[in-house]
């Protein structure tokens, strides 16, 4: 199935059902009083994280999603049926952003998490609610409120412990093939990797971590060159970044300049990502003598003023990969237990509440009482007053 990590949808919650005006009429009960029921609440729209789903492709073809409208109230004090909720299944790691405000509505990082993204309208009141000592035969009702409508941008961010970045053909995919069971495509031309991929690295029978590979970056990626930087978002949840540096680039470029290219693109994308723990991985040491290898590594470290961790490996021959994976596992285990950077769930507060909304309608009806009660039964005023939500 095609990998799609972004989609824009419209989530329409259901409108609330209207209240109704009705009076109890039975044999021998000529003046039974009001019995108009309330409407039903509108259905809500939810996002549900499912580990069995791994792409947002379905939302590319179906962008409009609506919950059911609440049923209108009925006579006999019958309340309308609540509208059915709309539940949208998304991959674990999906983030929902309001297109209009840029607000993060939900961030679903665990299987089974269910978050409301669009709130259904509240039910209207039947005329029974407006009965009072001075208005025994109310002909007022209130309409159900409109359901919330949101335009959402869904973004899928891979959940991995370690993320890899580097120029095309630096050896990232070869490294993942050598340390995990994943088999990303490997070839001798740029941008062999077109979509992100994951691999599980098993250090021993009981310990493992997940590593993510994204398409290579080139100079100007922040401005759209190559595949751009749209895939860098998949590294936001990673706890450690591996910066792969090719010691002997096929195009004859300078490893120092290549290293600065990646660092500059990271800085342009996000300070948060640029400040994550990052290790330098010098690849293809099997193609150089030990003396040349040390000379090139020293040159890069000096130019970057690097004081962090670095490793020399050959992804093809697996030289140095075992030590690297063990040290990665140890580092991951030493980091705080919260696996991912928690993004505070920000659900927009609905501007009105049931109790306040209904109380306002009843108060307004009392103030505008038209003296239409059973004492004036012979009066010919049977018009129904409809109260609209302000």
Curated annotation (Swiss-Prot):
InterPro entries linked: G_OBG, GTP-bd, GTP-bd_Obg/CgtA, GTP1-OBG_CS, GTP1_OBG_dom, GTP1_OBG_dom_sf, OBG_GTPase, P-loop_NTPase
Role of this protein: An essential GTPase which binds GTP, GDP and possibly (p)ppGpp with moderate affinity, with high nucleotide exchange rates and a fairly low GTP hydrolysis rate. Plays a role in control of the cell cycle, stress response, ribosome biogenesis and in those bacteria that undergo differentiation, in morphogenesis control.
Major place of residence: cytoplasm
Region (Disordered): 22-42
Binding site for Mg(2+): 173, 193
UniProt name for this protein: GTPase Obg
Domain OBG-type G: 160-333
Annotated localization: Cytoplasm
Originating species: Photobacterium profundum (strain SS9)
Biased composition, class Gly residues, residue ranges: 33-42
Gene field: obg
């Amino acid at each position: 199935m095609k990998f799609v990590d972004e989609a824009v949808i419209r989530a329409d919650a259901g409108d609330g059902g209207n209240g109704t005006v009705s009076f109890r009429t039975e044999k021998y009960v000529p003046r039974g009083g009001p019995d108009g029921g309330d409407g039903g609440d509108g259905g809500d729209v939810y996002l549900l994280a499912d580990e069995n789903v791994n792409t947002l492709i379905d939302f590319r073809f179906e962008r409009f999603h609506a919950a059911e409208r609440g049923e209108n109230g009925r006579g006999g004090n019958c309340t309308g049926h609540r509208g059915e909720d709309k539940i949208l299944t998304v991959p674990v790691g999906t983030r929902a952003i309001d297109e209009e405000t840029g607000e993060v509505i939900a961030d679903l990082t665990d299987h089974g998490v269910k978050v409301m993204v669009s709130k259904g309208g509240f039910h209207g009141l039947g005329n029974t609610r407006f009965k009072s000592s001075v208005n025994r035969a109310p002909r007022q009702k209130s309409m159900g409120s409109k359901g919330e409508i949101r335009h959402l941008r869904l973004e899928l961010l891979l959940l991995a412990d370690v993320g890899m970045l580097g120029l095309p053909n630096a050896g990232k995919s070869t490294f993942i093939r050598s340390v995990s069971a994943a088999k990303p495509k490997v070839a001798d031309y740029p941008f062999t990797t077109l979509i992100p991929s994951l691999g599980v690295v098993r250090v021993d029978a009981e310990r493992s971590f997940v590593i993510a590979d994204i398409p290579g970056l080139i100079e100007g990626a922040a401005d759209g060159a190559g595949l751009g930087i749209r895939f860098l978002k998949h590294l936001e949840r990673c706890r450690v970044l591996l910066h792969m540096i090719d010691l002997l680039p096929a195009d004859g470029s300078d490893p120092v300049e290549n290293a600065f290219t990646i660092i500059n693109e990271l800085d342009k994308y996000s300070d948060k990502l640029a400040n994550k723990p990052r290790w330098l991985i010098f690849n293809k040491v099997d193609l150089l003598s030990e003396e040349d290898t040390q000379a090139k590594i020293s040159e890069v470290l000096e130019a970057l003023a690097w004081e962090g961790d670095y490793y020399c490996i050959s992804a093809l021959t697996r030289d140095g990969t075992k030590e690297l994976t063990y040290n990665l596992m140890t580092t991951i285990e030493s980091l705080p237990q919260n696996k991912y950077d928690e993004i505070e769930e920000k659900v927009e507060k609905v501007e009105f509440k049931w109790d306040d909304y209904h109380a306002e309608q009843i108060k307004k009806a009392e103030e505008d009482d038209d003296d239409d009660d059973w004492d004036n039964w012979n009066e010919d005023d049977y018009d129904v007053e409809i109260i609209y939500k302000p």
